[in-house]
Amino acid sequence: MKQLYGVIGNPIGHSLSPVMHNDAFEHLNMDAHYHAFLVKEEVLGEAVRGLKALGISGFNVTTPHKVAIMDYLDEIDPLAKQIGAVNTVVHKDGKLIGYNTDGIGFVRALQSISSEPLQEKRILLLGAGGASRAIYFSLADAGVKEIDVANRTVDKAKELIAACTATVHSVALSLEKATKEQGSYDIIIQTTTIGMHPRVEHTPLQISSLKKGTIVSDIIYNPFETKILCEAKEQGAIIQNGIDMFVYQGALAFEMWTGCVPNIERMKQLVIRKLGG
């Protein structure tokens, strides 16, 4: 019998997940289908119970349900619980189990372009919202020991740091101070929506004095190269946009559901084509 997978969110029509996962199923000759389900906030509980009753094998969760979904699951992975958000659900032995592959997917994406272990790197996170939280906790879980957080509201950066139980040396910074100290970091990660289309002229941090070999990663993929990435590229940095994070988090969810490892490069090229690259 064909296995059913999907993604729930509102809006959902723009999602690239169905294209990516259905291509992977076809490429691996798997009898499965991935569908996008429009689910409004007021019927989330009913939708989750319905998906469970239908025997869905697993599904992704996107905006605005990543936090609210946690109330309707049977179990939640410890890392997802610490992050406070779920983006992947596995239906196993009659239970819906919630995970967060956003942060781990980002860490895997970052490792794919780093010639050295991330554990040895000094990292600066820009932003202290949900995406930053997932990435911060996942980097800490991966053994990174030095992660500073810069945010427009410094108190929010302090709250993020204080919530982590792992042994990490972290300092909360203003964006102004981070701008001055940018040359002391090995990796800079931009996790906010600043610079996203259509406000492409904006940047949270003016890149001006990076050290050689710095990696600058932005979770935005529209545009492919944000202002911060363009400036970093001019400084000779290794740059990475949000496509890698999107693909790696999706590939990890695919692996959790099926036990099969999809072709990452195939997924990435498909997403780039769909985005018009």
Swiss-Prot record:
SUPFAM superfamilies on file: Aminoacid dehydrogenase-like, N-terminal domain, NAD(P)-binding Rossmann-fold domains
The entry's keywords: Amino-acid biosynthesis, Aromatic amino acid biosynthesis, NADP, Oxidoreductase
Catalytic activity: shikimate + NADP(+) = 3-dehydroshikimate + NADPH + H(+)
Family annotation (Pfam families): SDH_C, Shikimate_DH, Shikimate_dh_N
Gene Ontology molecular function: NADP binding; shikimate 3-dehydrogenase (NADP+) activity
Matches recorded under PANTHER family: BIFUNCTIONAL 3-DEHYDROQUINATE DEHYDRATASE_SHIKIMATE DEHYDROGENASE, CHLOROPLASTIC, SHIKIMATE DEHYDROGENASE
UniProt binding sites for shikimate: S15, L16, S17, T62, N87, D102, Y221
Its job: Involved in the biosynthesis of the chorismate, which leads to the biosynthesis of aromatic amino acids. Catalyzes the reversible NADPH linked reduction of 3-dehydroshikimate (DHSA) to yield shikimate (SA).
Catalytic residues, chain numbering: K66
Family: Belongs to the shikimate dehydrogenase family.
InterPro entries (alphabetical): Aminoacid_DH-like_N_sf, NAD(P)-bd_dom_sf, SDH_C, Shikimate_DH, Shikimate_DH-bd_N, Shikimate_DH_fam, Shikm_DH/Glu-tRNA_Rdtase
Name assigned to this protein: Shikimate dehydrogenase (NADP(+))
GO cellular component: cytosol
Highest taxon listed in the record's lineage: Bacteria
Pathway involvement of the protein, from the record: Metabolic intermediate biosynthesis; chorismate biosynthesis; chorismate from D-erythrose 4-phosphate and phosphoenolpyruvate: step 4/7
Subunit structure as annotated in this protein's UniProt entry: Homodimer.
Binding site for NADP(+): G127, A128, G129, G130, A131, N151, R152, T153, V154, D155, K156, I219, G242
